[in-house]
Amino acid sequence: MSLLKDSTVAVITGTSSNLGFNIAVRLLEGLPDNKEITLVVTSRTLPKVKEVISDIKKYIVEKIPTKVNKVEFDYLLVDFTDMVSILSAYYELNKRYKHIDYLFINAAQGVYGGIDWTGAVLEVLQSPIEAVTNPTYKLQKVGVESGDKLGLVFQANVFGPYYFIHRIKHLLKNGGKIVWISSLMSSPKYLSFNDLQLLRSPASYEGSKRLVDLMHFGTYNKLEREYGIKQYLVHPGIFTSFSFFQYLNVFTYYGMLFLFYLARFLGSPYHNISGYIAANAPVAAALGQTKQNCKTASACTRSGKEYLLEEEIDSTGSDDVVSYLDTLTKEWDEKLKDQIVNTRQP
């Protein structure tokens, strides 16, 4: 239970990422100064939790000192590729809180194997803007399963968070808001309905984001009608993400940044580059500034001035996706019915 009486409770998955950190600080900036806030930081490991809490505290002191005594921190250790870990996170939230106001589904995972450098050079030479907007040279492993025998990327990015929401719906009921972070690269071409767990897909990350889009359109009306929960779909555009740095050296990193700025200069609205600008749409959605029946993107002008873009999504197949997820949910309810674990164990 929060020590701050009647505080606003926000759970941000993947808080230790660049986007997760910026969602946290922008949410704190966007909420009224008289609001007491409990920020529930999540990560897979305790060191990352400690690091991001320290970083957020430093930001509060330097940028929003009016919030210094208004913010309390809590944490969850949760791995969305592990159903027992998800169940454990549910138990902990259920013990500590009566209501959750904001839930950001930002945790995302890919199974990258590196970069096709020959393909990357050719793409950049042929179409530099397309090469840094919809790249095809990121190599992804095919057929990777989790320990639960589910498609790993499917479980991490789609089913794991979906099951988590299923478990904590009663905490979000009557006013809670869910914000799903999708991607610019979530075209229908990345998903086969014969491979919903993405085990045969060479673009499983993008396919998982297409599934997120379809899941949203198949569930947001029911969530609001039956539970009073508002769900939103957003994407952060293109920004510098920590997850891919391991494949870049100093030259390729700055080369990438140069192409990002070039794309923005030539008119791309999606090359936000800054994680802070990328977090605009997620936080705007949480604060009720976007619509539920579209996908809202973080965007910016050539000079870096931020704004929001509304995008229409082809929702064909959304009912089939939700039906599949609900069937899996029932199966895992049965498998986990006698399982009790401790999320505080690092």
UniProtKB/Swiss-Prot annotation:
Annotated catalytic residues: 182, 205, 209
The record lists the membrane-crossing segments as 242-262
Q: Under what conditions is it induced?
A: Expression is increased by itraconazole (which targets the lanosterol demethylase CYP51/ERG11) and by zaragozic acid A (which targets the squalene synthase ERG9).
From the UniProt record, list the reaction(s) this protein catalyses: 3-dehydro-4alpha-methylzymosterol + NADPH + H(+) = 4alpha-methylzymosterol + NADP(+)
Q: Name one GO molecular function term.
A: 3-beta-hydroxysteroid 3-dehydrogenase (NADP+) activity
Q: Keyword Membrane on this protein? A: yes
GO biological process, alphabetically ordered: ergosterol biosynthetic process
Q: What class of enzyme is it?
A: oxidoreductase
Report the membrane topology from the UniProt record.
Answer: Single-pass membrane protein
Task: Output a single Gene Ontology CC term carried by this record.
Answer: endoplasmic reticulum membrane
Residues that hold NADP(+) according to the record? 19, 42, 48, 205, 209, 241
Metabolic or biological pathway: Steroid biosynthesis; zymosterol biosynthesis; zymosterol from lanosterol: step 5/6
Classification via InterPro entries: Ergosterol_Biosynth_ERG27, HSD17B7/Erg27, NAD(P)-bd_dom_sf, SDR_fam
**In which family does this protein belong, per the annotation?**
Belongs to the short-chain dehydrogenases/reductases (SDR) family. ERG27 subfamily.
Q: What is this protein called?
A: 3-keto-steroid reductase ERG27
